Amino acid sequence: MLDIKLFREQADTVKSKIELRGDDPKVVDEVLELDNERRQLIGKTEEMKARRNKVSEEIAEKKRNKENADDVIKEMRELGDEIKENDAKLNEVDNKVRDILIRIPNLIAEDVPQGDSDEENVEVKKWGTPREFDFEPKAHWDLVEELKMADFERAAKISGARFVYLTKDGALLERALMNYMLTKHTTQHGYTEMMTPQLVNADTMFGTGQLPKFEEDLFKVEKEGLYTIPTAEVPLTNFYRDEIIQPGVLPEKFTAQTACFRSEAGSAGRDTRGLIRLHQFDKVEMVRIEKPEDSWDALEDMTQNAEAILEELGLPYRRVILCTGDIGFSASKTYDLEVWLPSYDNYKEISSCSNCTDFQARRANIRFKRDAASKPELAHTLNGSGLAVGRTFAAIVENYQNADGSITIPEALVPFMGGKTEIRPVND
């Protein structure tokens, strides 16, 4: 959520930033109009309260002097009614302002490229060279079924489309990837591992920006009023919700592996086969809570943490900056890492790393103190995939496939696969 002071002091800047996202900048004028009404109501209420205090003194004086106080008592009651009426109006205006503010996205960083869609994202780095096969490579959805690593048909019977059973070596590979990623982040990148709730309340979803705007993308347990998490960013970022972080604690670096649940509303017909776009998938997440002056360096570092996984696994990838028309609601700047998938003959998103500045912290009321005597300040929050496990699984299967139908295990994963160096057809 944005600070209303920005609307008062930098209205033109806020308008231009909102317009860059393709949204209507008139919302700024609406906020300012309501804010002006709000301040007038506050001023009027303060005047009435001051008058009420004076009338109270007049009543007391009249009673001391044994004079008739009926007229001032009547005025006192009228003032009380007017104050209540004004407070109700003020509460209504406050709610209107808040309802607008919570739907306005974060302000975009200065170096974010302008564009209307993902086609205008800007590549800033490329690592590795896509493999040239001397045979016709297969798509991962065919390979995993041939190798008995996954069963989409039975998953559809149990749960419907966009679900999967991972079986035998498929389950082993998924677990190995999760363990490898968590080990890398905790032992080499300095993150603290967490195991989080995977059902959260509406306040938690509001804190990270999923609610109210993106409710259709979520799965909800109606009876309990809880939501399944779309990413571990949600519980990790909200760890300090409504708290003041004490001096010396920041920076905080959290990582967690969770299942993630997404309705994929609006994605009908996209990536309908395989592991790329499921309703339920595993992901290792990184979340950082930083002092404002450190958050931009933290974004670069966190992105490099995700890149280190891809490089050690030997998976070709590229880094892009998301343009103004593709960046997420809560983010000020986002890097996407896209891994090479032969079945698409293209790069596909495998990680998204964002600096949300103080946007989520204001919604979730996450503050910190620099020292014992200082006033609390809003922290900056960052999040990044480190990595999406299912997409990493798919990338390994496709990029490490062999002509005989087997899959070579990347060297970095072998210790997490119980020493297994390849996955071969079951009849071998």
Swiss-Prot record:
GO biological process: one example: selenocysteine biosynthetic process
Record-listed ATP binding positions: 262-264, 349-352
Subcellular location: Cytoplasm
Catalytic activity: tRNA(Ser) + L-serine + ATP = L-seryl-tRNA(Ser) + AMP + diphosphate + H(+); tRNA(Sec) + L-serine + ATP = L-seryl-tRNA(Sec) + AMP + diphosphate + H(+)
Keywords tagged on the record: Aminoacyl-tRNA synthetase, ATP-binding, Cytoplasm, Ligase, Nucleotide-binding, Protein biosynthesis
Superkingdom of the organism of origin: Bacteria
EC number(s) reported in the record: 6.1.1.11
Chief site of localization: cytoplasm
GO molecular function: ATP binding; catalytic activity, acting on a protein; serine-tRNA ligase activity; transferase activity
Binding site for L-serine: 231-233, 285, 385
Pathway where it operates: Aminoacyl-tRNA biosynthesis; selenocysteinyl-tRNA(Sec) biosynthesis; L-seryl-tRNA(Sec) from L-serine and tRNA(Sec): step 1/1
Record's GO cellular component terms: cytoplasm
Domain remarks in the Swiss-Prot or TrEMBL record: Consists of two distinct domains, a catalytic core and a N-terminal extension that is involved in tRNA binding.
HAMAP family named in the record: Ser_tRNA_synth_type1
Similarity comment: family membership: Belongs to the class-II aminoacyl-tRNA synthetase family. Type-1 seryl-tRNA synthetase subfamily.
Function of the molecule: Catalyzes the attachment of serine to tRNA(Ser). Is also able to aminoacylate tRNA(Sec) with serine, to form the misacylated tRNA L-seryl-tRNA(Sec), which will be further converted into selenocysteinyl-tRNA(Sec).
Entries under PANTHER family matching the protein: SERINE--TRNA LIGASE, SERYL-TRNA SYNTHETASE
Protein name, as recorded: Serine--tRNA ligase
Gene: serS
